[in-house]
């Protein structure tokens, strides 16, 4: 929880009141929300479940995009990144199956500090695959 502690410290230091963190399965929370309340949702390096038999456990899929669409305000943003190429392809396929998001060509999240997972991925020669989406309907 060291990473969460650092984020909480930064939130406190900067006196931010409009940020909420979830350390569990966000899908359980989103399923309970019945209105569009979020301006943006960031999902940075979700578990890639690299083994083929575990791919069904991956968070980002068409169903999750539908759930997230429900809780985003109109023109709200969804940012997803992964460092696993085959997960990126799967995410891209899920996005292409939906017409509820506009894919933004340039990311407004390029300023984000890299996480330890992202830094390690780059050091190991893996690429970061960002997806920046805007709710359009």
Language-model segments: what does each one mean?
Residues 38-59:
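A short SAM/SAH-binding and catalytic strip from SAM-dependent methyltransferases
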Residues 53-54, 77-98:
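Conserved class I S-adenosyl-L-methionine
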Residues 88-137:
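Class I S-adenosyl-L-methionine
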Residues 16, 73, 96-98:
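Short, well-ordered coil/turn elements that cap or connect secondary structure elements
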Residues 58-77:
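A short glycine-rich, Lys/Arg-flanked "PGG" loop and its adjoining helix->strand segment in the class I
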Residues 5-40:
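S-adenosyl-L-methionine
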Residues 1-6, 88:
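Short alpha-helix immediately C-terminal to the canonical SAM-binding loop
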Residues 9-10, 71-74, 126-127, 132:
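Aromatic-rich, lipid-facing transmembrane alpha helices and their immediate juxtamembrane interface loops
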């Amino acid at each position: 929880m060291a990473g969460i502690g650092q984020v909480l410290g930064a939130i406190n230091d900067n006196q931010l009141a409009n940020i909420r963190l979830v350390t569990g399965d966000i899908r359980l929370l989103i399923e309970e929300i019945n209105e569009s309340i979020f301006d943006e949702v960031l999902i940075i390096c979700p578990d890639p479940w690299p083994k083929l038999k575990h791919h069904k456990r991956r968070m980002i899929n068409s169903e999750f995009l539908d759930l997230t669409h429900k809780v985003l305000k109109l023109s709200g943003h969804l940012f997803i990144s992964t460092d696993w190429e085959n997960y990126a392809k799967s995410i891209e396929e899920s996005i292409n199956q939906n017409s509820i998001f506009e894919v933004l060509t340039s990311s407004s999240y390029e300023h984000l500090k890299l996480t330890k997972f992202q830094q390690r991925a780059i050091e190991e020669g893996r690429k970061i695959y960002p997806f920046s989406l805007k709710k359009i309907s």
